[in-house]
UniProtKB/Swiss-Prot annotation:
NDH-1 is composed of 13 different subunits. Subunits NuoB, CD, E, F, and G constitute the peripheral sector of the complex. NDH-1 shuttles electrons from NADH, via FMN and iron-sulfur (Fe-S) centers, to quinones in the respiratory chain. The immediate electron acceptor for the enzyme in this species is believed to be ubiquinone. Couples the redox reaction to proton translocation (for every two electrons transferred, four hydrogen ions are translocated across the cytoplasmic membrane), and thus conserves the redox energy in a proton gradient. Its cofactor is [4Fe-4S] cluster. It is found in: Cell inner membrane. Keywords: 4Fe-4S, Cell inner membrane, Cell membrane, Iron, Iron-sulfur, Membrane, Metal-binding, NAD, Quinone, Translocase, Transport, Ubiquinone. It comes from the Bacteria. The gene is nuoB. [4Fe-4S] cluster binds at C52, C53, C118, C147. Coiled coil: none annotated. Its EC number is 7.1.1.-. Binds 1 [4Fe-4S] cluster. This is NADH-quinone oxidoreductase subunit B. One of its GO terms (molecular function) is 4 iron, 4 sulfur cluster binding. It catalyses: a quinone + NADH + 5 H(+)(in) = a quinol + NAD(+) + 4 H(+)(out).
Length: 213
């Protein structure tokens, strides 16, 4: 079998003009769109959790759900290297200033996902010691309802956030007023990259030997 890394039709030949070669190898776009596309596909979550919902958040990092498919596999242990924080669990009054301090240390631009009923609105804890919604002291980009939400719900919320970043949603227009509904969670099917790229891999039957590249 012959090995080839590029399709024959896209390999420059002596008969092609410079314009034809450039058109096949260059992508023209706006710098803002390119940066937004890069940011949306390389979100770095901060490894931070508060309560029960963090268990579901951590489950999304496992191989079964594989959040790395959406470019968020680089889990950061420090807020100074993260640009996404998921408020997952009950926000107690004692933790509110700690969360705000962690948020202030994150890189700009930064995004916040509010995960679970307790983080969204206090949940069942309508008491003096629990903040009735993290949006009382943080700007929230996306709300994921549930008690607790499933990992699929968090990943679906992540895809919605990615689309908002790609579309260039202004940071000043927060919150985005976007709440995931149970119907959307149920209808959301986890993307299977293996099946999506199956036909593409099957067609790649001509590869160039490494010593001839």
């Amino acid at each position: 079998m012959r090995w080839q890394l590029s399709k024959p039709e896209i390999i420059p030949t002596s008969t092609q003009t410079m314009q034809e070669v450039v058109e096949k190898n260059l992508l023209v776009t706006r710098l803002e769109d390119l940066v937004a596309w890069g940011r949306s596909n390389s979100l770095w979550p901060f490894n931070f959790g508060l309560s029960c919902c963090y268990v579901e958040m951590a489950t999304s990092f496992t191989s079964r759900h594989d959040i790395a498919r959406f470019g968020s596999e680089v889990i950061r242990a420090t807020p100074r290297e993260a640009d996404l924080i998921v408020i997952s669990g009950t926000v107690f009054l004692k933790m509110a200033p700690v969360i705000k301090h962690l948020y202030d240390q994150m890189l700009e631009p930064k995004w916040v996902i509010c995960m679970g009923s307790c983080a969204n609105s206090g949940g069942m804890y309508d008491v003096y010691s629990v903040v009735q919604g993290a949006d009382r002291f943080l700007p929230i980009d996306l709300y994921v309802p549930g008690c607790p939400p499933r990992p699929e719900a968090l990943m679906y919320g992540l895809t919605l956030l990615q689309e908002a970043i790609k579309d260039g949603a202004p940071r000043q227009a927060r919150p985005l007023n976007r709440t995931i509904t149970p119907e959307e969670i149920q209808a959301f099917a986890c993307r299977n990259m293996r099946d999506e790229k199956h036909e593409q891999r099957i067609k790649a039957d001509k590869l160039t030997p490494p010593d001839e590249v």
